[in-house]
Amino acid sequence: MARVLKSVALVVLVLIVAIVGIVAFTFLGRMRPTDGREVGGARIVVDGFSSVAVVPLRDGQVALVDAGNDGTGAAILLELQRRNLDAGAVAAIFLTHGHPDHIGAVGQFPNAEILALADEVPLIEGAVGARGPLPRLFPVNPTGITVTRALRDGEVVTLSGVPFRVYAVPGHTAGSAAYLANGVLFVGDSADTARDGTLIGAPWIFSDSQDENRVSLVRLEQRLVADGADVIAIVPAHSAVMQGMGELSAFASANR
């Protein structure tokens, strides 16, 4: 029996080491985001290994793209303080998807409307679990978050004169979204910036379907071109800003 327990413990240890190694390799292969980077009027706030975008609106309000990893929202609140604002100034939070490192501080902003694609609402609210190889290992529990506005693909939400166009990019999760505002395309985890500056798709270990993610990015590029969108920058949640749409177009050309 002791020998069996030792063997099981060894297997578990090997699995843990392997998972940690894969996760570390995944993040080391990305170009890290820069805290305080400003693009298209938005400011990037790094929150641990994730990031949040603060988009200024009129009348002293802001919108957030995602809500970070830290449940206290410390990094976001510090940025608001820098602007002489408090938590009540957050009018809306656009969630790219429902993984924990993107919804952490939602509860810190009671005045905010919570927006996400309809297909992502069950994951955000904790009614279902994520299906990626690593996320599926975690238990499914209610998050205490209520999405107050379920969005449709292609919808435009205008806040204080700032339009946010919604693009469905399923693959990383079932209802992953990208948002285009002031020429900046916020893609969450659906794309990343590699060390060499090229655009790469969502990492397989965290994603429901890497193949679907790839198809979605190709379709996203086609739709942006068809819409005549003036994309000045692409902002992933876990990696550096990419200027213009060139890297997305290169990715799409290579994966059609």
Language model regions located:
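Metallo-beta-lactamase
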Residues: 163-168, 174-246
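Conserved beta-strand hairpin/beta-sheet module of binuclear metal-dependent hydrolase folds
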Residues: 33-83, 178-193
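Internal catalytic-core helix/loop-beta-alpha segment
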Residues: 148-161, 166-168
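Binuclear metal-ion centers of metallo-dependent hydrolases, dominated by the metallo-beta-lactamase
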Residues: 242-256
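Active-site HxH/HxHxD metal-binding segment of metal-dependent hydrolases
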Residues: 71-74, 81-149
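Zn-dependent metallo-beta-lactamase
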Residues: 2-61, 246-247
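Divalent metal-coordination and catalytic microenvironments
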Residues: 55, 66, 97, 114-117, ...
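Hydrophobic "anchor" residues on beta-strands that sit immediately upstream
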Residues: 62, 93, 113, 185, ...
